[in-house]
């Protein structure tokens, strides 16, 4: 499917420049290096190095806000970073909103919101070790 699972509207991988520009659209997480970690538009933490990694809960994809199937384009204004599970949940829905609190009871959404939390970082940028 063209424009699906993090590809452009022609089914090709996005360029490195586009990936970086879309990454910068994600919201920084206070106290954490924004080059490594940010939040997608739904508030779910994503990790820069996990772009396209659907085996990681921090994996993310480039989503077409308005899907190509509904007339959307590859223009940067129509692209957003989205945690991969949410991107699959969204599919070609348009308009689409992040799942609300009541929808978090759906198994696929609940798994995302309950299991995806930002890593614990100390002020020095080092991972905190739980004892």
Model region roles, listed by residue range:
Residues 44-82, 92-94:
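Histidine-centered nuclease catalytic patch
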Residues 85:
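Short, cysteine/histidine-rich loop/knuckle motifs that typically chelate Zn2+
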Residues 1-4, 9, 41, 50, ...:
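Intrinsically disordered, low-complexity segments enriched in small/polar residues
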Residues 39, 82, 96-100:
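Flexible domain-boundary/linker segments
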Residues 2-51:
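Short, charged surface segments at domain edges that flank catalytic/cofactor-binding sites
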Residues 70-77, 88-131:
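Polybasic, low-complexity binding patches
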């Amino acid at each position: 499917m063209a424009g699906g699972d993090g590809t452009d509207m022609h089914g090709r991988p996005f360029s490195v420049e586009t990936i970086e520009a879309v990454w910068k659209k994600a919201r920084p997480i206070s106290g954490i290096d924004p080059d490594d970690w940010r939040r997608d538009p739904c508030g779910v933490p994503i990790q820069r190095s996990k772009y396209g990694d659907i085996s990681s809960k921090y994996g993310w994809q480039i989503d077409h806000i308005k899907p190509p199937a509904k007339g959307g384009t590859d223009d940067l204004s129509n692209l957003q970073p989205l945690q991969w599970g949410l991107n699959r949940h969204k599919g070609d829905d348009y308009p689409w909103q992040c799942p609300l609190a009541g929808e978090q009871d759906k198994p696929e959404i609940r798994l995302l919101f309950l299991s995806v939390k930002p890593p614990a970082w100390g002020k020095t940028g080092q991972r905190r070790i739980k004892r």
